[in-house]
Amino acid sequence: MKAIVTGISGQDGHYAARHLLARGFAVTGLTSDPDKIAGVQAEFGDQPVTIESFDYAAPRAIEAVIERVRPAVILNYAAKSTGTGMFDRAFEMARLNGAFVLDILEAIRAIDPTIGFCQASSAEMYGHVDTSPQDERTCFRPKSPYGAAKLYAHNLIGTYRNAYGLKCSSAILYNHESVRRTTHFVTRKIARAAAEISLARAASFSLGGLDALRDWGYAPEYAEAMVLMALSDKPADYVLATGTLTSVEQVCRICFEHVGLDFRDYLVIDPALQRPIETTNVCGDPSAIARDLGWRATTGIQDILVEMVDFDLQTLRGAPALGHTTC
């Protein structure tokens, strides 16, 4: 059995590949950065993984890859990320986060309609929320180019599933973290700061505020859910979430208490770091996927954050990094 994983050099692509390997798949992983190929390939050792450079901006180029590999499943994690500068990259975001999914769907329709395809959608599609928790029937009102492009792709998935009977599905992903996150994301930024300050490598850290609430889960578990969705004979869209909100302040407290410190002694609030257009306080209802596929998020936020801080402590002390590879 063969699988294609786009965005394999990212957090989710890595864990998805691990889950697929555990199920006996040979994986072709695509990355837009040729400089990452050797490093990503080395992480998988002698396992049946092939890493290839791919230009996601090239219209319909994915068709040739699918024709050559002939996968049983495809998982798409390729995306321009949310955050600062989104409006400056709106065209790129529309192409990669939206139109590229159309390329995949058209290729599947032409080559092999039995391919199982799971798309990484996002809770940022909800945007302005007035109900909580959100589920698969909650109205989407995105506030950003990222959310709008993801919603375009999400709607395409449903359209092609209904019109052509394709085995395609969308995972509406809420925030999901691991040691493979970059410090662009607030949980990793805080965990790294706790480790650095505890080792006297830094004196302070800055955040835009403490009040924001998020539904944070564990990335390896969410990758597993997407594999289950891609393999399902009854494709559907599902919310992947924990159903529990955690504040940025709680994240700070957990990380710093783990190293015996009070975060308030080191935090600098910088209003310039606030992101007013963000989707705020979204909390997902994962009951549908629990009912249909038996999947539930089981790793709590405290365990996730402690793993991150310990990873950074070891890295900063010069020990080998604690790469998370068990799936």
Predicted regions and their residues:
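Conserved C-terminal active-site "lid" loop/helix of NAD(P)H-dependent oxidoreductases
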Residues: 219, 271-296, 315
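Mid/C-terminal beta-alpha module of Rossmann-like enzyme folds, strongest
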Residues: 190, 228-275, 286
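Amphipathic terminal alpha-helices
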Residues: 2, 300-327
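Conserved Rossmann-fold NAD(P)-dependent oxidoreductase catalytic core, especially the SDR/UDP-sugar
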Residues: 76, 102-145
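NAD(P)H-binding glycine-rich loop region in Rossmannoid oxidoreductase-like domains
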Residues: 56-96
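Active-site helix of classical SDR
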Residues: 145, 149-152
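NAD(P)-dependent short-chain dehydrogenase/reductase
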Residues: 130-133, 155-230, 244-245, 252-259
